[in-house]
Amino acid sequence: MMLPQNSWHIDFGRCCCHQNLFSAVVTCILLLNSCFLISSFNGTDLELRLVNGDGPCSGTVEVKFQGQWGTVCDDGWNTTASTVVCKQLGCPFSFAMFRFGQAVTRHGKIWLDDVSCYGNESALWECQHREWGSHNCYHGEDVGVNCYGEANLGLRLVDGNNSCSGRVEVKFQERWGTICDDGWNLNTAAVVCRQLGCPSSFISSGVVNSPAVLRPIWLDDILCQGNELALWNCRHRGWGNHDCSHNEDVTLTCYDSSDLELRLVGGTNRCMGRVELKIQGRWGTVCHHKWNNAAADVVCKQLGCGTALHFAGLPHLQSGSDVVWLDGVSCSGNESFLWDCRHSGTVNFDCLHQNDVSVICSDGADLELRLADGSNNCSGRVEVRIHEQWWTICDQNWKNEQALVVCKQLGCPFSVFGSRRAKPSNEARDIWINSISCTGNESALWDCTYDGKAKRTCFRRSDAGVICSDKADLDLRLVGAHSPCYGRLEVKYQGEWGTVCHDRWSTRNAAVVCKQLGCGKPLHVFGMTYFKEASGPIWLDDVSCIGNESNIWDCEHSGWGKHNCVHREDVIVTCSGDATWGLRLVGGSNRCSGRLEVYFQGRWGTVCDDGWNSKAAAVVCSQLDCPSSIIGMGLGNASTGYGKIWLDDVSCDGDESDLWSCRNSGWGNNDCSHSEDVGVICSDASDMELRLVGGSSRCAGKVEVNVQGAVGILCANGWGMNIAEVVCRQLECGSAIRVSREPHFTERTLHILMSNSGCTGGEASLWDCIRWEWKQTACHLNMEASLICSAHRQPRLVGADMPCSGRVEVKHADTWRSVCDSDFSLHAANVLCRELNCGDAISLSVGDHFGKGNGLTWAEKFQCEGSETHLALCPIVQHPEDTCIHSREVGVVCSRYTDVRLVNGKSQCDGQVEINVLGHWGSLCDTHWDPEDARVLCRQLSCGTALSTTGGKYIGERSVRVWGHRFHCLGNESLLDNCQMTVLGAPPCIHGNTVSVICTGSLTQPLFPCLANVSDPYLSAVPEGSALICLEDKRLRLVDGDSRCAGRVEIYHDGFWGTICDDGWDLSDAHVVCQKLGCGVAFNATVSAHFGEGSGPIWLDDLNCTGMESHLWQCPSRGWGQHDCRHKEDAGVICSEFTALRLYSETETESCAGRLEVFYNGTWGSVGRRNITTAIAGIVCRQLGCGENGVVSLAPLSKTGSGFMWVDDIQCPKTHISIWQCLSAPWERRISSPAEETWITCEDRIRVRGGDTECSGRVEIWHAGSWGTVCDDSWDLAEAEVVCQQLGCGSALAALRDASFGQGTGTIWLDDMRCKGNESFLWDCHAKPWGQSDCGHKEDAGVRCSGQSLKSLNASSGHLALILSSIFGLLLLVLFILFLTWCRVQKQKHLPLRVSTRRRGSLEENLFHEMETCLKREDPHGTRTSDDTPNHGCEDASDTSLLGVLPASEATK
């Protein structure tokens, strides 16, 4: 129907009205306003559909927005988004496959791009995406989705012997297809067997012999973990995507244990032979690849044949035939059946039968041992009979321990035995084994360990031989000189004397000889004979003693009579005879520590440290019968020696019985001074203490060991989880959850080096499994051992501008969680504040005062008593996780200076100011105390406002300490802790210059009341030596500078802050400002708004100070508010106490790595490295905006120093936010070298580059002194969310890959990121170690963030909707009033307004009548217009009665 000519029609989207009555106008106004409000809250008509597919559950994805259908781009699309689509449309979504929509050429809108879903959304548009209609795609990238339920998929095994064997086929899209064997393994096969309800005790898998050529290949590169419920839940290429042929189709058989059988064949009994396995009636062999002794043990145990002998080579057995069933078998030894072991699959066609495995079990051994071709039954070549055949043993690694076992097994005398090389056998077959290892305690040779396989070859083709003898047959002597303790060494063997060749002769050999002859110690060790050459046999050669042998023939040698020497190589030995020897440690804390001294030739002398090591120290401790659990090297507290240096270049093996048995340069031969004297500390566990230091709790940090008062940090060499487990257990800190290597920075720290770690992780104490070595130098690569134990609870306060207030969060196992108010008491708050070095708790809060947390809440109730030093030490009570809502999270406000008081006054509200710092009370210096500080102090003490503050001895002194802390309060703070504070470089303050305060809450009046008409606050009435500062309404400050002592000058006067004009502004004027603010002298009087233009009044102009005034307003000027300036002429000042901070590098432009320098007194100078820690480095980096952490290092060799140093000995807790708050030595300019200066490299800074906004681009990280990128492997919205939140850029809209913002440069720092999305920093997520990646820059990751925080976004969007709707309603109301006015004018001209004369109507009635008259028009024919107005597809409001608005027919009621 046509719209009448005189009808009113308003259309706003779907909301429109057309009425000609007053009520209709009001209805339209309210309806349109409501509709706008609804539209503001996204109440749009959004729809979703799939088109051009096989049905409503497949096809191209289309979204209806603003009445128009459009497609979705495939950028960022994944199966999670497909699942959301299927779920929203009510389609089956147990499997949702996405496809591209390029098969159909489309036109029109592309509504969505970069869609990223979590999977729990109820509609597609609730996922993250670009703005509607914003994209960089074409329709060839339209995304499509196919939704499938379980009913659409199937799995079966076909063409096998039964339903549990055959070719693997999968049903997809109503069609059965095969699976390619690429990536197929036993985990995947196990999923198939379990899904089909088939047994899975043993699984045989391979490829088919008869491929299914007419079927599709559905899956390829399938990878299962083994615990999936269905095969299609495993990772794969995608349905129908493959690069295979049907010759690669997978087949498998699922076996029950009843289908399997094991045997040993080819031996003399059932417990020895070739290993064979029967599967479904067919016997096959096992390939030796990866076979080990544990596998052999499993075979013997399964067959009830005892245990496996520790050799498996049976070269005489006939090889197997038929199939090789198993390959790559690897057992732990605990398995009950061989098929329970891990293996690489069945039917191996690459393994030949010559590699078949054989086993001999202990219950089936048919073995015999003999010595052949010797002088008797107890000497000769070693031979072993196996299966009626004699075999020899290769002499490779053959030693006396093996010979001892042979002698004992044959029942031969073994008080003396020797090993030898035997001549080849004419009877025995080939070498049976070529490497056997015995301890000497075995009862039979086959109880020794061996290398596991038969050997057919032997290096140099030498058989092992043995000579077993009795001690009565042997003797020893030294001949050719006039002393029985000096001469040529001779040995009697088989009734004949013979010599010993010098090959391999050593000090230990000589020590055994001297000890055996009762001749003391060896004096001269090396050298061949210069006596008359002997005759007769050379019995021994290549003698090698350990040093603890009783006889020289007990040492290893080449065999009796086996040598390659002549008699001029005979050994001579010189022993000490009756000489007296001695050893001691002097100058230490006890007899087992100190400087090492040796007594020789009647004199004590020292030992030089050339070549000295822990083995030599161990010999000393053992010789002195001192404990040796931990051995320290170095003098420690002992001084250097004097006199003779007896030994040098000492080299021990560690098992010598005394120090002089070790190799050395000879008595008295050295090239040393006493500065190189050796020191030794011998200790055991009773002298040792273990703790963790430098962490945020007692269960985290670096490993520190205290030995007899000497403290050292454990070096990180060999550091790992096995050692960390022992540390955590010993400290009662649970188990280790993280180990790390941290750099060392302090020169004076001793170190402990792990020279031998045998920790398995199950030991009760670290001393049970580690051999130690003291080091007075740095660790290898300067890295120290650090760890975090499971009992570690690291707290923090977040959500506030100050580090000592905020929402309580506790970190455990890399996750931060908020704490519920019911789980946290005031006692716990006090413990937390003390742990954070934040003083005491002054308040607890509940709710979102400090913002709401995210993720799960803490699942423990802290039951602190209040006296604990760390929150982790409080008793806890577990409760179910996430039982607390985020609106019940607890917040804490701490104050370091809650311990503040006024003492020595008339009441608690007047007196000398004292604060407690680090547990010590002290007064404050009055040098930088001002009225604003006094106001805050009185407010904090609930003592009203400050009346006056005094300097000197106005009230008196009693404090021992005078602290140098300088508070810079504005006057409106509630606590001193909220004021800016500096202490760095503060000079000592002498007594008599301390500050006192009188507050209005005092019970007494000020002794010297201030005079209102005196502008100078320093009154002459104050006693000499004191100064009374009256508090007035004039204040001074510097703003917009880089520190409190530089900036634009502003004065508080008459209730407003204002500026000063630069007319006549000079150093004299600026000097008054600097002195008033305690900022030294003026360096620069800046003009022309150098620090930016101010606002408010310009209070002073044409100042003309002499520089001696106490206040700026005492200088001559035009008068308050009198000027001819603008703010572009605002004056500023830079004072000598102006400080700045930087990291300076001579070659690098990046300001986040280099020498730490401070600007003071007009020049840059360095900072001393004494006491600089990683915590201080972190404060510097955060203060400079260079990241969260820093690494301190020594000066690079190529760098030069600054030449002088400004400050040193900085001490700072990690909770400070500025280095200016740290304690230090006073400011002092002194010459310094690069080695004395601090060098810092900041870490863990993040930025985005290459994007179109500051919140989008390629992700880059500053680490190890350079910028690098992040690889996009596993990059997703969770990782992007962490980046966006860390940058303060709101929430993540998209996680972009493939260098979407261009390729970066430098190192790719992080790869394989795994974030939860609630981490504070990207590097808190799990990832590969720093710098380890397999990516190129074409894979650089990027992000696109919303640009504002979620909180502000949500708040602003709701408020914006309300504001806009209200404005729109008011606008319509104004238009309505204007319309009424126009109607009145028109009626006065044409149709005079008629009002009922019978009774006065209400205003509403008159307005209604006027509207009705005005709106109802007659057409040219005089007929009334119709109300039949077409609705144009919108919702007609003609019959709508809104609440509070009556229809016209009811208006007069």
Swiss-Prot record:
Cytoplasmic topological domain: 1381-1453
InterPro entries: SRCR (IPR001190), SRCR-like_dom_sf (IPR036772)
Tissues expressing the protein: Isoform 1 is highly expressed in the spleen, lymph nodes, thymus, and fetal liver and weakly expressed in bone marrow and no expression was found in peripheral blood leukocytes. Isoform 1 expression is restricted to the monocyte and macrophage cell lines. Isoform 2 is only expressed in spleen.
Residue ranges that the UniProt entry lists as topological domain Extracellular: 41-1359
Domain SRCR: 48-148, 155-255, 262-362, 369-469, 476-576, 583-683, 690-790, 795-895, 900-1000, 1036-1136, 1141-1243, 1246-1346
Keyword Plastid: no
UniProt GO cellular component terms: external side of plasma membrane; extracellular region
Disulfide bonds: C73-C137, C86-C147, C117-C127, C180-C244, C193-C254, C224-C234, C287-C351, C300-C361, C331-C341, C394-C458, C407-C468, C438-C448, C501-C565, C514-C575, C545-C555, C608-C672, C621-C682, C652-C662, C715-C779, C728-C789, C759-C769, C820-C884, C833-C894, C864-C874, C925-C989, C938-C999, C969-C979, C1061-C1125, C1074-C1135, C1105-C1115, C1181-C1242, C1212-C1222, C1271-C1335, C1284-C1345, C1315-C1325
Signal peptide: 1-40
Name of the protein described by the UniProt record: Scavenger receptor cysteine-rich type 1 protein M160
Organism: Homo sapiens
Gene that produces this protein: CD163L1
